[in-house]
Amino acid sequence: MPIDKIITQINETAQLERASFEEMKRKEIDQKFEVKKWQIEADFQKEKASKLEEIERSYRQLRNKQKMQVKQEILNAKQEVLQRLFTEATLQLENEPKEEQLALMKQMIQTLPINGTARLIPGEKSADILTPAVIAEWNEELPFELIREDFTEKAQAGLIIDDAGIQYNFLFSHLIKEIQETMSAEIAKELFD
């Protein structure tokens, strides 16, 4: 029976080797599974962090864009208020009593460095008050002579003095615009701070 014993021993050895091989393969599979699982988890965490960063970046961009829009809207509203203020100032100047308008115009032209004669171009809205009598009265007091033109500056109040091509613009809208250009920032600071 030694053959039976050898066969049994071979079977037992084969069974042990198979069990050992199966155990080794199972551990190898488990190890590969764990490595793959860890890799998938790491990739997932990396992807999650990347997506989260992308969402945060998009949120920051959107928030900054909204802040800029709000600032722009506030700036536009302030500019609109300032523009309305200067438009109202022009209208108020145009609606001053006739005597005050004439006094203002006379005061402005008295400072001009003109010799000889100059042309007076009235604004359409002031043409009725810049009568020949008013101009004659001014000519008596001025060191130069004004000659009134027949045409007017359309839809304007005030006047322009033309001294041989050099024009002195005293239209009320122009005067207010000069104030707007030089004092806009200062007025805005007073109004909005």
Curated annotation (Swiss-Prot):
PTM annotation: The N-terminus is blocked.
Q: Which InterPro entries match?
A: ATPase_V1_Esu
State whether keyword Ribosomal protein applies: no
What are the record keywords, sorted? Ion transport, Sodium, Sodium transport, Transport
Q: Which GO terms describe its cellular component?
A: proton-transporting two-sector ATPase complex, catalytic domain
Q: Which domain of life is it from?
A: Bacteria
Which SUPFAM superfamilies does the entry link to?
V-type ATPase subunit E-like
Kindly state a single biological-process term from the GO annotations of this entry. Answer: proton motive force-driven plasma membrane ATP synthesis
Select a single GO molecular function from the record's annotations and give it. Answer: proton-transporting ATPase activity, rotational mechanism
ATP-binding among keywords: no
Family membership, please give it.
Answer: Belongs to the V-ATPase E subunit family.
Describe its function. Involved in ATP-driven sodium extrusion.
Under HAMAP family, the record lists:
ATP_synth_E_arch (MF_00311)
Put simply, this protein is called V-type sodium ATPase subunit E
- Organism encoding this protein: Enterococcus hirae (strain ATCC 9790 / DSM 20160 / JCM 8729 / LMG 6399 / NBRC 3181 / NCIMB 6459 / NCDO 1258 / NCTC 12367 / WDCM 00089 / R)
